[in-house]
Structures are given as C-alpha cells and as structure tokens.
Swiss-Prot record:
Function: Binds together with bS18 to 16S ribosomal RNA.
Keywords: Ribonucleoprotein, Ribosomal protein, RNA-binding, rRNA-binding
A GO CC annotation given for this chain: cytosolic small ribosomal subunit
A GO MF term: structural constituent of ribosome
Residue ranges with Low complexity bias: 118-134
Similarity comment: Belongs to the bacterial ribosomal protein bS6 family.
InterPro entries for the chain: Ribosomal_bS6, Ribosomal_bS6_sf, Ribosomal_S6_plastid/chlpt, Transl_elong_EF1B/ribsomal_bS6
GO biological process: translation
Organism: Geobacter sp. (strain M21)
Region (Disordered): 103-134
CDD domains per the UniProt record, alphabetical: bS6
Identification of the protein by name: Small ribosomal subunit protein bS6
Length: 134
C-alpha cells in the first residue's frame, strides 16, 4: 500500500554543488528504484543548527516528499545513515495531503479599536443608579 511520506535530511554545509547534486540524484534513485512516486525535493539552504552535530554549527537542509511503502523508508534511511555527508535525517508518514492554511484577513488599527470598544460596551453591565428618598 502506497502512503505519502516526507523526509528532511541535513548535510554538511561545506559540500560543493556537484556533491549535493550527486546526493540528491542518489536519493531520487532510491525512491524510483523501490517503486516510489517522487513528488518534490526542495533545498532549504544553510541554517544554524540548534546544537553542533559532528562539530558542525550549521547544516544544509533538504526536504523530500514522495509516495511509497515502508520498505522504501527503510532503504532510504539505511542509505542516508551510511552516507558520511548526511549528518541528520527524519522521515514521517503524512496522514493526508498537507494544504497551507489560508491567511487570516488583516484588520486595520482603526477597525480593531472600534470593535474592541463595541465588544467592551456590550459585555460590561450598564451602570444603574437608584435614588432612595427618605
């Protein structure tokens, strides 16, 4: 049964373009060789790591999305683990197709203050004064 997966892997930041292209081709070949359906490969660029990994304070991130089965995940992770250029990787199964949420409408500052004042007026109880004659 084919399921959708995504893998993020981090490589050493000092790799050249040819080495990165060879690694990306190798990853795509693993997916194709195991009858997977390759969807997307994105280069997220070099970023600072939360903590140094193998004395590297930075890493180059790659995002991979594909359809396949559990055997494909096992083989892909095995190949990433054996490659010295890859310093970390993580694969997860996606439940459904991920859709970006729609942006919330932005209110201007004047509209926001008027709405807050209107809400405060409706929520606050009206002050009543009673006069008592003696």
């Amino acid at each position: 049964m084919s399921r959708m997966y995504e893998t993020i892997y981090i490589v050493q930041p000092d790799l050249g373009d040819e080495e990165i292209k060879a690694l990306s081709t190798k990853v795509q070949d693993v997916v194709a060789g195991m009858n997977g359906d390759f969807k997307r490969l994105e280069d997220w660029g070099t970023r600072k790591l939360a903590y140094p990994i193998n004395k590297n304070p930075r890493g180059r991130y790659f995002y991979l999305r594909f359809d396949g089965d559990s055997g494909l995940i096992a083989e892909l992770e095995r190949r990433l683990r054996l490659d010295d250029k890859v310093i970390r990787y993580q694969s997860v199964k996606l439940e459904t197709e991920v859709v970006a949420p729609a942006a919330a409408p932005v209110k201007s500052a004047e509209e926001g203050t008027e709405e807050v004042a209107a809400e405060a007026a409706t929520e606050a109880p009206a002050e009543t004064t009673t006069t008592v004659e003696v």
